[in-house]
Amino acid sequence: MDIFLAVLPAIFWGSIVLFNVKLGGGPYSQTLGTTLGALIFSIGIYIFVHPTFTPLIFGVGVVSGLFWAVGQSNQLKSIDLIGVSKTMPISTGLQLVSTSLFGVIVFHEWSTKTSIILGVLALIFIIVGIVLASLQSKEEKEAEEGKGNFKKGIVILLISTVGYLVYVVVARLFNVDGWSALLPQAIGMVIGGVLLTFKHKPFNKYAIRNIIPGLIWAAGNMFLFISQPKVGVATSFSLSQMGIVISTLGGIIILGEKKTKRQLVGIIIGIILIIIAGVMLGLAKS
């Protein structure tokens, strides 16, 4: 039962972008709707949990949420350019690399020879996995010469990675508990969502529809907080990376993104390598 709880965040988070695309609207309406959904769910959690608030917790939570909006909005922009099945392995890999390196440099996480070996191997696996998952078909290469969508998508994902990195590490730097940060984060997410999208007139029916992915995201967060004390941070972190399977294969199977046989093989091997790397990083943290 505990492992099942720990897998739920991956299932929930892995399905978010599939819901975003299926529910329609551009990345701006999708971002705004998702943040609103997260706020609604977080208010409900606050009513039942009653976490402790201080000015520091509130401020850190809001800043964290603002940067989550940067990460999510740019991830959705990348999906709009290069698709879910290409965006998500690259995005997940970049997030793992950035958070791991930050953990090593700032928090000195890899303190033993074993953890250093595991960590370095994991980073190599991630890089190889990203390369394999981002293979282009002949048609895509020809289209790239004209539009340059893949290059644009990668640049946007680098910005997204910075957003997600700050979202994750700022709460840790100030030792803010996840339950306490949940509502302030959601408030920051909505503020960030509005600031990043209001010029593009995102307030429409698609923003309302995309409240659903926001509810799903917040539910995934809740199950992460519940599972961590039961299975440990390392295990819950490793299992949460499995969402890449749902989002990537969902992009191909559910959303109908076309791939060549070579690309499919590259994506599958790339996903496996990134998942293995996630497990190795979890072990290196423990």
From Swiss-Prot:
Disulfide bonds: none annotated. Keywords: Cell membrane, Membrane, Sporulation, Sugar transport, Transmembrane, Transmembrane helix, Transport. Its main location: membrane. It is a multi-pass membrane protein. InterPro entries: Sugar_transport (IPR010651). One of its GO terms (cellular component) is plasma membrane. It is found in: Cell membrane. The chain crosses the membrane at residues 4-21, 28-50, 54-71, 84-106, 116-135, 154-176, 181-198, 211-228, 233-255, 262-284. The keyword Zinc does not apply. One of its GO terms (molecular function) is carbohydrate transmembrane transporter activity. It holds the Pfam family Sugar_transport. GO terms for biological process: sporulation resulting in formation of a cellular spore. Belongs to the GRP transporter (TC 2.A.7.5) family. Involved in the uptake of glucose. NCBIfam families: RhaT. This is Probable glucose uptake protein GlcU. It comes from Priestia megaterium (Bacillus megaterium). The lineage of its organism: Bacteria, Bacillati, Bacillota, Bacilli, Bacillales.
